[in-house]
Amino acid sequence: MPNKPFQSGAHKGLNNQKVRHYNCRLVMALLYKSKGMTKSELARETQLSIPAISKIVDALVEQGRVENFSVSKATKGNFGGLYKVSSDRPYTVCMSVSPTRIQAVMVDNEMTPSSDFIDQAITPQTPDELIEDIVTAIVACRQSKPNTSYRLSIAVHGQVDTHVGSSMRMPQAPWTQTIELKYLLEQRLLVEVLVDNDCVMLALAEKWLDGHHGEDFCVLNVDYGIGSSFLIHNDIYRGKMFGSGQIGHIKVANNGIICGCGREGCLETEASSTALCKQYLSRQENASKLVHIDDFVFDDFVKLYQNDDPIAQEVAMHAATILGQSLYNFLITLNINKIILYGNTCALGECWLKTITQQTLINPFEDENARKQDLTVVSFGHLTQIERIVGMSYLWVEQELDNLYT
């Protein structure tokens, strides 16, 4: 039987030009991460020769992407100064937007915060009101540098169409229609806008700010909803239909509870902070009247849990067990061995984490004799709130690197 011919254009080799482009991308990424490096440092990190690095940085300087700074430094031999990303770039206003809160900070060309951190509770009832809240936060962010050119990078809770920059569905919001965030904000503010999911923001922050050295990982955000994002082969995995990482909508129970997505028994109905509060109140109503139902929020649940309230303890451990089992089922197909947890449920602490871990690590395919760094680890994320929001600025960096020579 004759071999089938390769599909035209499906397999492309790397000619010398593409190798140079790859190396330029690598150097630019290092400069963004390090905030500045010498030629010798770049050569050491990339394992390229000094002459090869010289050609790369000279080309990047000529293109206006990189600048050379003279630095007073006692050294033997020639010292070519420090190379940094060009200052001829707009600032970036980074935002995280949910139906109840907006957080924002402005960063400079090196992705260093240059404004006050905005953390504002909001109560929009319509998409138009949400747009007004976003614009108000942008104005507050730009108070320190009102005349500086800028661009927007917005992380949105829920499903996002990244191609057109729209919020397709925002759970917990009092509306159901799509919001064309990119179009509306670009038309109103006359700036460039990128929009993505809030879990992607966390994954970008972990990738660029927490030094994972190219490891695959999953970020799991367990808050009033549950979402996730994956870094695979150093790239954020999004999927074709913008639905990747929707672990919160795995069906885990026939509990009769309808999720915000319209289906019954999703993980969010069992393990999110909203679900924990509802389950506690349901159980507490049958036990004793210790809690005022109308004012009960997740912080109240955490206090009860930390004070060894038996109902809160049981509800939290049940949720952790289901969450761990779901993680196992979800991740065993991808064989990702690093899971990083964020969200308000992390306030439940180490016992909650241990229960999740015990369920997640029941993996018959994991080699007990594997290297420590190859074993599965479930841990809390350690980035600060500001660092997480700054993560959205790297959406622009990744776009620049992807389009470096297109």
What are these regions (language model features)?
Residues 1-71, 75-118, 122-148, 267-406:
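ATP-binding/phosphotransfer module of carbohydrate and carboxylate kinases, centering on a glycine-rich
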Residues 108, 162, 231-232:
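Short, acidic, Ser/Thr-enriched surface-loop or helix-capping motifs
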Residues 157-160, 223-225, 345:
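Short glycine-rich anion-binding loops that position phosphate/pyrophosphate groups of nucleotides
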